[in-house]
């Protein structure tokens, strides 16, 4: 039993990202397409940064697989047909800690002085400022802020999942 968290409802999955060769300004915001499960934006250096679906199996490897690349590239070209001739410069895989309901765990842990902030799925990088503020409040006051009060570990054991329509290791897929 590790720190009282031997039953964490989290799985690790690889989420791939890709960068194209630089090009003139094309996209000045982050574009997402829920149905195609794609996000794309343009870096300051001109490369398009895009990604999408998870690899379909649990892994701690920091590399992706070809079928996911093909799926994500096809979604990108569907959204922006002019991308079909761009060269891909690099790709990588990041480990996503996927909770079973698609929502993070931000709460006091099962042991005194232990606090949990995990299971962020796809939203961790984007939600970090607000979540950090709520997490700091939880640690300082030893009680949750109203904004993270529902994001407890015990919700999985009490049948109070937060995103039932997106339950499972693929929260965006129903």
Predicted regions, residues:
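ATP-dependent carboxylate/phosphate-activation module, predominantly the ATP-grasp catalytic core
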Residues: 14-16, 67-68
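FAD-site-proximal beta/loop scaffold in flavoenzymes
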Residues: 16-22
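Active-site lid/adjacent beta-loop-alpha segment flanking the redox-cofactor pocket in flavoenzymes
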Residues: 6-7, 22-113
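A generic alpha-helix surface/boundary motif
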Residues: 12, 70-71, 130
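Flavin (primarily FAD) binding-site architecture
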Residues: 1-5
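C-terminal catalytic lobe of FAD-dependent flavoproteins
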Residues: 34-35, 77-174
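Short hydrophobic/aromatic-enriched beta-strand-loop microsegments
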Residues: 7-14
């Amino acid at each position: 039993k590790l720190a009282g968290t031997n039953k964490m409802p989290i799985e690790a999955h690889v989420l791939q990202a890709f960068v194209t060769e630089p090009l003139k300004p094309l996209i000045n915001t982050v574009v997402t397409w829920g149905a195609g499960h794609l996000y794309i934006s343009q870096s300051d250096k001109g490369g398009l940064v895009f990604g999408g679906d998870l690899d379909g199996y649990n892994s701690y490897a920091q590399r992706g697989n070809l079928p996911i690349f093909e799926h994500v590239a096809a979604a990108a070209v569907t959204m922006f047909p002019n991308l079909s001739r761009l060269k891909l410069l690099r790709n990588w895989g990041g480990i996503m800690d996927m909770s079973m309901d698609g929502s993070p765990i931000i709460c006091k842990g099962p042991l005194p002085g232990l606090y949990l902030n995990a299971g962020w799925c796809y939203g961790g990088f984007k939600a970090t400022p607000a979540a950090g503020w709520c997490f700091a409040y939880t640690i300082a006051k030893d009680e949750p802020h109203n904004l993270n009060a529902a994001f407890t570990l015990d919700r999985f054991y009490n049948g109070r999942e937060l995103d039932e329509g997106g339950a499972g290791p693929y929260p965006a897929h129903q």
